[in-house]
Each structure stands twice: as structure tokens, then as C-alpha cells.
């Protein structure tokens, strides 16, 4: 049980997908202008990453490896992710039309989010078991959501701050992301993976 807890904490804080592995930067920068949009995208991405991580592990273990179709791994993972995203989009549209409108084009773009594909591929490359894949996928998603929500809160405060003209917009956003990355480096001694 402690192994799963260490894997979770290590994935969320120490090896964060956005700030350490630099995966998922497009939605990180694009959806983080408003806090409520970032929270909604975080929930949707958490669901998709966790389910896609489990589904891709199952596909690899029970279909691709036994049939020696490893060359189709990336393509099949993208297909699994696309199916999970479509399912998520249907659920969000039915349960929260406001959130569906707020997320707009970013919800279907979860399919091309490199963090979602990255967690599926890293699970296989690190030879995780089923439970480790589920914990790793959930931890990566929680870390992604945590960083996106924190970044959105900071960007909302920066929108009303007195920032010099050359630094407004994406410039201050990238500087802020860099400072957040430095702050998360403080967790590097927390868990040895």
C-alpha cells in the first residue's frame, strides 16, 4: 500500500507531468486564463487520463503483446484515448452544458494532449502492473489538474496586476510557469523513484 502512495505522491509532486516532464503545455497555457475553466478541464482531464491509462494497459497486456502487435502500440493508444474523450464529452454535455460551452474546443483537444498519451506510453515503458498503471494515471492527472488550477489562480491575479507592457500575456505566463517549476523542485527529495 505504501508503494502506491509513494507512486502517487511522486507522480503528483516530484515528477509532475507539466512542470517536470513538460507534457500537456498546450492546455496548461490555453485553458488556464479563468479558474472555473481550469477546474472543469482538470476534472475532464483527470477522468480521461485515469481511464485511458487503465484502458491502454489492458489493451497492451491482453491484445498487443499476445498477438505480437507492438508496432501498433502508439496508434492503438491514440484510438483508446479518442474513445475515452468522446465518452467524456458526451457525459459533460449531458451533465453540465455550461461547462461544455466554457471548455469549447479544448475538450476534444484532450485527444491530442501529449500528457494523456505520455502517461499511457510511460506506463508500458516502466513495466507497471495494473494497479500501478491506475495509480500512475490518476497521480499524473491530479498533478496536471493541481498545477493548472494553481496557474489559473495566479493568472487571474496577474490580469489585474500592474505588469510592464513587454511582459503582459504569454510572457508573464511563461515566467510564472518557470517559477512554479522551481517551486515544485523543492519536492524532489520527498520521494525517490
Swiss-Prot record:
Q: What's any one GO cellular component for it?
A: plasma membrane
Its transmembrane ranges are 5-25, 39-59, 62-82, 102-122, 134-154, 171-191
Instruction: Give UniProt keywords alphabetically.
Output: Cell inner membrane, Cell membrane, Electron transport, Membrane, Translocase, Transmembrane, Transmembrane helix, Transport
Q: Does the keyword Transmembrane apply?
A: yes
Q: Which EC class is the enzyme in?
A: translocase
Please state where this protein is localized: Cell inner membrane
Q: Does the keyword Glycoprotein apply?
A: no
How this chain assembles, per its entry, is: The complex is composed of six subunits: RnfA, RnfB, RnfC, RnfD, RnfE and RnfG.
Q: What is this protein called?
A: Ion-translocating oxidoreductase complex subunit A
Q: Look up and give the organism this protein is from.
A: Proteus mirabilis (strain HI4320)
Amino acid at each position: 500500500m505504501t508503494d502506491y502512495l509513494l507512486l502517487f505522491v511522486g507522480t503528483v509532486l516530484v515528477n509532475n507531468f507539466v512542470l517536470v516532464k513538460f507534457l500537456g503545455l498546450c492546455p496548461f497555457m490555453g485553458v488556464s486564463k479563468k479558474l472555473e475553466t481550469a477546474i472543469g478541464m482538470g476534472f475532464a482531464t483527470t477522468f480521461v487520463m485515469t481511464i485511458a491509462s487503465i484502458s491502454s494497459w489492458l489493451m497492451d497486456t491482453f491484445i498487443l503483446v499476445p498477438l505480437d502487435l507492438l508496432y501498433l502500440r502508439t496508434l492503438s493508444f491514440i484510438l483508446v484515448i479518442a474513445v475515452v474523450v468522446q465518452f467524456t464529452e458526451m457525459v459533460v454535455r449531458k451533465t453540465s452544458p455550461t461547462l461544455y460551452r466554457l471548455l469549447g474546443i479544448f475538450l476534444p483537444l484532450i485527444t491530442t494532449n501529449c500528457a494523456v498519451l505520455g502517461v499511457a506510453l510511460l506506463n508500458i515503458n516502466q513495466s507497471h502492473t495494473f494497479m500501478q498503471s491506475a495509480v500512475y494515471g490518476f497521480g499524473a492527472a491530479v498533478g496536471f489538474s493541481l498545477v493548472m488550477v494553481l496557474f489559473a489562480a495566479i493568472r487571474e491575479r496577474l490580469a489585474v496586476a500592474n505588469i510592464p507592457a513587454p511582459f503582459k500575456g504569454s510572457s508573464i505566463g511563461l515566467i510564472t510557469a518557470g517559477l512554479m517549476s522551481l517551486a515544485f523542485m523543492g519536492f524532489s527529495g520527498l520521494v525517490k523513484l
